[in-house]
A protein has these predicted regions:
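Long, charge-rich, low-complexity alpha-helical segments
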Residues: 30-89
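Acidic, low-complexity/disordered tracts enriched in E/D and polar residues
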Residues: 1-39
Length: 89
């Protein structure tokens, strides 16, 4: 998977929000606020170019004290949300 071109993480009123660059790509019904961990994962995914749930889960285990099973469950849920709003392909 990869992050679709044109979507970026921005801070809006103290919140980390995924949004489309340019007004044509912006759909306020599909803005997604991220917590600190999800924003960290987003930045890892952007930096990687291509990513997998397992790869991000492994990265998460290296950064936070979390079991591999819990990391995979959490990453899968976050990536599912990204897919739901159409920011990954």
């Amino acid at each position: 998977m990869k992050i679709k071109k044109g979507f970026v993480l921005r801070e809006v009123c103290g919140e980390q929000v995924i949004m489309g660059e340019g007004l044509g790509a912006l759909d306020f019904g599909k803005l997604l606020c991220l917590n600190e961990t999800a924003a960290w994962l987003w930045n890892r995914a952007v930096g990687a170019g291509e990513f997998t749930v397992d790869g991000l889960a492994e990265d998460l285990c290296g950064e936070y004290e979390v079991s591999p099973e819990q990391a995979r469950t959490d990453v899968a849920a976050i990536v599912a949300e990204w897919q739901k709003v159409g920011v990954v392909e």
